[in-house]
Amino acid sequence: MEGQQVLIFSASRRTDIPAFFGGWFLERLRRGDLAARNPVNSRQITHFRFDPAAVDCIVFWTKNPAPFMSCLDEIDGMGYKYYFQFTVTPYGNDIEQNIDKGNIIDTFIRLSERIGADRLIWRYDPVIINDRYPIGFHVDRFCSMAEQFCGYTEKCVISFIDRYQFLSDAMRRHDITELSPLQIESFMGQICRTLDTLPSKITLSACCEKTDLAAYGVQRNACVDGELIARIRGVQKKYRKDPSQRPGCGCVQSRDIGTYNTCRHNCVYCYAGRGKKKTACNEDSPLLCDTVDTVNDTVKLVDLRQGA
């Protein structure tokens, strides 16, 4: 196994594939053929050919997996291993503009019952505050959700809003401010007391936080989690840390196959949607909402099929 390429698909940090592009993704798995642009140099494309044996795991990121649930039986039947990161937050359509929260709790529970609590990670991410969403609001809603999700997940990932430069205007329009250390301390202290009372443990992890949360038993998170992937696969294996992620990130190496500016949720805090929206998706194309320009693109083929 030493030196063999590891293929973990991240689907995706850049868009919500389960909510909007499940048909495209399922078709790519059927064909064993998928491509992604380099986000730094958009003219560089990596084109993967693979079979289930070549893919260690698929990490799904979503705010609404309901449209994708019908795909899971076929994905299981093909032999792919996967887990979900499911963001459930208490914001209204002022912040998360196109998310219907009416059945979100039921969807979380149904997905957990389908795949298991160990393969469903709850993300309360990010925590943002303004006059409508003060710290007390977050404490109440987090604790209520934690009680409802108890037994249906084993882990919750939290993060606090980062002031990306290109988000400054959106943050000002909604009077969003970064949390002070005292506000973070207040939030963490109260939610940890609730978690300690739950009959089934939910472990807290934090994503690349500057504030030290170790006093609250908060672990450094790995969204693309090598230890979890090894457990799901039933193997003893160490995965390499991803050098392309932010300092403090615990993720192992993966290939993100999403495309920026394709998510339709239109969350005001999102770092992945800062250009003209691409919504047309061709299931015959290995690229999401995109096609290969045979004149200007450089394509690197990576063939990981058995016997290739």
Sequence positions of predicted segments:
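Conserved Radical SAM active-site core
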Residues: 1-95, 101-117, 277-308
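Conserved C-terminal portion of the radical SAM core fold
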Residues: 103-169, 190-208
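Catalytic cores of enzyme domains
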Residues: 153-260, 285
